[in-house]
Amino acid sequence: MKKIAVLTSGGDAPGMNAAVRAVVRYGIKNGLEVIGVRRGYSGLIDGDFVKLEYKDVAGITEKGGTILRTSRCEEFKTEEGREAAAKQLKKHGIEGLVVIGGEGSLTGAHLLHEEHNIPVVGIPATIDNDIGLTDMCIGVDTCLNTVMDAIQKLKDTASSHERAFIVEVMGRHSGYIALMAGLVTGAEAIIIPEIPVDYSQLADRILQERRRGKINSIIVVAEGAASAYTVARHLEYRIGYETRITILGHVQRGGSPTAFDRRLALSMGVEAVEALLDGEADVMIALQGNKFVRVPIMEALSTKKTIDKKLYEIAHLLS
């Protein structure tokens, strides 16, 4: 193997740049030519390639986002789109591909290998932390710290004004960020897709706490469970006073990655290159315990990552 490519796809996650840096520099150290694919799978189809040298990735570990840019590519979901991508790889003599992204990106990588025998290795990068067989995905720790910091600031104003704040965080199918952020900030309630919410019971809890002298409340809701406005409507009707809504939105994706995310991304990038050099394909790099391992992409994607209900109960008890 003499030439490989790397791309970032789907929603950006803090730490993607660190992974790109590791792939580029470790690849070059092992005698490989490394090509960067701009704009994810869209760039792969269009042939938007750039040769990456050692100096091109200097100083990017601490930067959020992705220097390669990213996209969500509908065309790549079609057989014709994947065929066009495979032709571009073969045209440019690229013998292996590292894909950094979430569930959709990794599914695309698997199909590219299955249909066109392209050696691919996936690196899980998504703030939802919803990829199976890996303890953590790149970007999760940074996102969690961003959310925690925002909630702590909201608690200051909630206390000053004696208000209930509803904080909506990302998580279309997974409540991981909401659960962990709610736990570490002492939120009065956490609403996640995995566990049904009883608004009457929730309102009773808030009113009970208020009678005990708790003058402010923080309710953390994952976007996939309900919108903050829906939660506010249900609660205001039952508790009899106005709430305030904060939707954190895309701020959760940005920012300089934490030390944990940098280390995770750098290690996964190195392992991805080693996997290609070892002749492996259609695998994802995963963190299991304190070890980095290679697992089949579809096995990871078909393994449902469940919420730790004990943590949910602990968060409820400690609120």
Swiss-Prot record:
One GO cellular component term: 6-phosphofructokinase complex
UniProt EC number: 2.7.1.11
Amino acids binding Mg(2+): E103
Pfam families reported in the protein's UniProt record: PFK
GO molecular function: 6-phosphofructokinase activity; AMP binding; ATP binding; fructose-6-phosphate binding; identical protein binding; metal ion binding; monosaccharide binding
Binding site for ATP: G11, R72, C73, G102, E103, G104, S105
Gene3D superfamilies: 3.40.50.450, Phosphofructokinase domain
Matches recorded under InterPro entries: ATP_PFK, ATP_PFK_prok-type, PFKA_ATP_prok, Phosphofructokinase_CS, Phosphofructokinase_dom, PKF_sf
Annotated control of activity: Allosterically activated by ADP and other diphosphonucleosides, and allosterically inhibited by phosphoenolpyruvate.
Compartment(s) of residence: Cytoplasm
Subunit-level organization: Homotetramer.
Protein family membership: Belongs to the phosphofructokinase type A (PFKA) family. ATP-dependent PFK group I subfamily. Prokaryotic clade 'B1' sub-subfamily.
Record's protein name: ATP-dependent 6-phosphofructokinase
Source organism (scientific name): Thermotoga neapolitana (strain ATCC 49049 / DSM 4359 / NBRC 107923 / NS-E)
Lineage of source species: Bacteria, Thermotogati, Thermotogota, Thermotogae, Thermotogales
